[in-house]
Amino acid sequence: MDTKFSGSANYVASRDLMETVNIAVALQKPLLIKGEPGTGKTMLAQAVADALGKKLIIWNVKSTTKAQDGLYVYDVVQRLYDSQFGNAGVDDVKKYIKLGKLGEAFSADEQVVLLIDEIDKADLEFPNALLWELDRMEFYIPETKETVQAKQRPIVIITSNAEKELPDAFLRRCVFHYIEFPEQEQMEAILRVHFENLDEQLIRQSLTAFYWLRELRGIEKKPSTSELVDWIRALVAGGVDPARIEKEIPFAGVLLKKDKDLQTLRKVK
């Protein structure tokens, strides 16, 4: 089992990213990952877990998510229901406490990788509300008068699409890395992870067209890595001759998701 992250069979990581992951693990600090959509931020956590032989726990953050959700939930409604119908054990408050994803990570007997995904989707108070728990690796449950302490400090990876600026106090506690969009050479390596025995001409033509499209003036939503992978799947499924890609972009709707971008493409292809 590896003790340091050096990528995985399914994830191509740059040297800078590998070094940053290992520094965050060594310093026992959360790793904050930013980058445009489709650069592999979320997949990084799975790759780290796979490479280090750890279980992955995922906390998907939404606009309605509160920090409390990650700690525990007290099902007071169920307890009230049980008390009305005389169900046994209603006095045992622990029955109605369900740990959230952070609570699960703290309670795990072995070290886990905890992914807090898209933290910037929540309100501005969300990151600050987690400062104590991430610093001290513990939280208090007043309903049971118990403190939940991390048995093993989890490896915490936090992703952000930079939709909102995160508080300075939160940033100071993190190791930060911005995942740059892959250069063509690295992208080719990524494609070879996803596809075995892919036609060499198809790889060259599709990559040339993809990067040309990303640089095309007027494109508002540039296609991402995941959309490139889907596009190549479409090209293979459609039996497209690689030579055709020099003249047009087949199945452009797999790459471009805005009407305006499709219209921009039609003007030049």
Please annotate each region the language model reported.
Residues 1-269:
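C-terminal regulatory/interaction module of P-loop NTP-utilizing enzymes
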